[in-house]
Amino acid sequence: MAKIHELSEILANQIAAGEVVERPASVVKELVENSIDAGAKQIDIIIEDAGLKSIQIIDDGNGIEAEDVETAFKRHATSKIIDRKDLFKVHTLGFRGEALPSIASVSDVVMETAVSGRAGTKIHIKGGEVLEKTLSASREGTTITVSDLFYNTPARLKYLKSVQTELSYISDIVNRLALSHTDVALSLTNNGRQLLQSAGNGNLQQTIGAIYGVQNARQMIKFEDANLDFKISGYTSLPKLTRASRNYISLLVNGRYVKNFQLTKAVIEGYGSKLMTGRYPITVLSIELDPTLVDVNVHPTKQEIKISKEDELVTFIQKTIFERIGQENLIPDGLQNIKSKTKEKLDFEQLKVGLNEASKQYQTKQHRTGITSEVTAALFGEKLTKDESQTQTNEKIKEETKVELSPIIIKDKQDLKSDRVKEWDEKYQSRNKETEVTSIAEKNGSVDDKRKDTPRFPTLRYIGQMHGTFLFAEGEEGLYIVDQHAAQERVKYEYYREEIGKVSPTQQNLLVPIVLTYPTTDALIIDENIDKLKELGIYLEDFGQNTYIIRQHPTWFKEGQEESIIREMIDYFLKDRKLSIAKFREKTAIMMSCKRSIKANHHLDDKQAKSILEQLKTCENPFNCPHGRPVLVKLSNKDLEHMFKRIQDPHHTGILEED
């Protein structure tokens, strides 16, 4: 009797479902992608109990012809490719023909679909078997309902996470789909509670606001660039807005959300030393390239891809983000943390209006799962944008709020036109208009004329030092507080980065050579990278089994720390044996700058302090130390005037009553 036999189609589909359908989020992803491929512009995702009970996808796409409905649930049946050539130039999200049969084999599926001008079709499939197929009075588009997921695969059902965890996975993938297809209006509802509603108007910035919150969207800047092979665009957050996970970086390749470690790493490295260790930006990166340069047929989920010329793309992304971030003045607002604790709910409502009305419409306070967050003013205080919609909001506040401003007494509206009120407004409001935050479109778009005229780093005049740790300086826009250690660390980092790259032949001979001994495993790695050490001026001579002797060192070493510096440099290769020369130089420069910089409680004279400020101004990046900490913060003139009540809130022009 033959031992090898062909598996039944239902069993084969259930096996395939192990890769295609991992959890309810996989079902949502596959079905929504089918809707997008069908030309849908409105897709409603309605789930119960995070998809464990039911998942319903309703779209207004092209629908499926009656004669194709049953065929669509057969393995490798698709309308998206025909021959081998199509496989290497895929323009659709799906093409393998595995999703529908895999889903139907492990659940109870009911689908109603219709094409324009024709009667609809309803089909009911459970466990891969067709139970019913009838005509139906359906509108154009498709409605598919999946219930009892994994009812016949108890092992898979057993290892699903909690309802909240599964809901977060669904929310995450829907967010990514909304970001990659901004022209499609997506809504997600769980147990009657709406979690997301995107506008579907093609505005990426607005979609980001709907997902991450309007305040976060305000702190993201637009970037775009193109060369012969690639076109990249998107939004990325300023260094002050970060997260503890790389999960907030969304990579979109030809409209497909993908995961790629090298591209994610390129985004992070584009920030250089502007990010704190362990912190990551919020980024939406869209990459457009010829489909022949990318292979999406790597895994059934199609989230893992292979890209030709990946190294060139990595360099291109890193360079584009680095240059875009470099255009920004990254001095943080010194009162940001204080403001964040005292902001009232009213300020948050005003801020939401600032992005645009459509963003306000689709902002949802219930969206708390997955990568989304309900942003409140208590977390991200931000200056308000002076746009038309905000002005209308402020006018409403003026009418409702009454504030006593002695000694000016206003009895009626005519008194608002008095000379004293005009004099007050001219004195305390006219100059503030010059420092208003620009609109979000200007802020996140190309640099406007006003910003081009503003120097990237201010001219500072030294005032004094506090506790041997902070330097105080004044500039045209206000008071600046400088962390003296972080400032000198930045200056020395850029100095050592350049010096280490020179590899001067001049060496300092050691009176007593340094002898280093390592275990065999470490010695093998050191031998593998010994040429890289030579490029930085570290010459290790063989001095017996697993032992090395150093007789000289570069002149930029700090006296008395020669052995510790060399050991630390060698440790870099022991931790990462594939460390590149460029990364090695950067790590060494960071180490040297930290070791040779002044510390806290170190009192400086005026000449030394002024020298640090002058050197800081010449730095390529004067805003952060090599570890990402801020070098200085600013208290603007307006902030100081607010603190001393020299200017009042915008609603001070309300009608007042005389006692």
From Swiss-Prot:
Pfam family, one: HATPase_c_3
Keyword DNA damage tagged: yes
SUPFAM superfamilies: ATPase domain of HSP90 chaperone/DNA topoisomerase II/histidine kinase, DNA mismatch repair protein MutL, Ribosomal protein S5 domain 2-like
Keyword check for DNA repair: yes
Gene Ontology MF annotations: ATP binding; ATP hydrolysis activity; ATP-dependent DNA damage sensor activity; mismatched DNA binding
Cellular-component GO terms for this entry: mismatch repair complex
PROSITE patterns: DNA_MISMATCH_REPAIR_1
UniProt keyword annotations, A-Z: DNA damage, DNA repair
Cited function: This protein is involved in the repair of mismatches in DNA. It is required for dam-dependent methyl-directed DNA mismatch repair. May act as a 'molecular matchmaker', a protein that promotes the formation of a stable complex between two or more DNA-binding proteins in an ATP-dependent manner without itself being part of a final effector complex.
Name of the protein this chain belongs to: DNA mismatch repair protein MutL
Source species: Ligilactobacillus salivarius (strain UCC118)
Taxon lineage: Bacteria, Bacillati, Bacillota, Bacilli, Lactobacillales
